[in-house]
Amino acid sequence: MASSSISFSCAPSLATSLFSTTSSSPRLLSSRFLGTRNLKLRIRPARLGPSNGSRTTCWFKFGKNGVDAENAGIYGSQSRDDFDRDDVEQYFNYMGMLAVEGTYSKMEALLNLNIHPVDILLMLAATEGDRPKIEELLKAGADYSVKDADGRTAIDRANSEEIRDLILGYSTQKA
């Protein structure tokens, strides 16, 4: 995959909002947030934009020389203990389970069994067939053999053979 860098020009609508248009005197644009290279540039609101010679670039990079989400600690680098009850509730809401169930009683029942939140999330994700979430949770150390109140595991709750195979396949890769 080819690496690329991303650069932005300072948009007139953004920059003009930084200045008072009632004053006719030019002002200095020296924002570290915008990352402008020429900090001695005097800017009049009427001339603000890419044609004034200023250039703004992002301070983050993607691709070969950048950082991916997993190494940045954003996705996939969580451990079991990084998940808590709030994550279970947020996922329950996000996946529309509250709308379907009409109550938090099933979620609360799972939480009251003293099952670790990451294992509850795996059961819910398997029920929904949420492949990316299942992969994330298995990487974090979720245990697919934990049973719910009905004695069902994440494998039992999986909504398709593909999801069962994903969970079982991860367990054989890990071993």
UniProtKB/Swiss-Prot annotation:
The keyword Chloroplast applies. GO terms for cellular component: chloroplast; chloroplast envelope; chloroplast stroma; chloroplast thylakoid membrane. Keywords: ANK repeat, Chloroplast, Membrane, Plastid, Protein transport, Thylakoid, Transit peptide, Transport. Signal peptide: none annotated. Its main location: plastid. It is found in: Plastid, Chloroplast thylakoid membrane; Plastid, Chloroplast envelope; Plastid, Chloroplast stroma. ANK repeats lie at residues 117-149. Residues 1-68 form a transit peptide. Disruption phenotype: Not able to grow photoautotrophically in soil. Pale green, slow growth and no bolting. No appressed grana in chloroplasts. Highly expressed in leaves and seedlings. Detected in roots, but not in germinating seeds. Interacts with CAO/cpSRP43, but is not a component of the transit complex. Interacts with LHCP (via T14 domain), TIC40 and TIC110. Involved in the import of light-harvesting complex proteins (LHCP) and subsequent routing of these proteins to the chloroplast signal recognition particle (SRP) pathway. This is Protein LHCP TRANSLOCATION DEFECT. It comes from Arabidopsis thaliana. The gene is LTD.
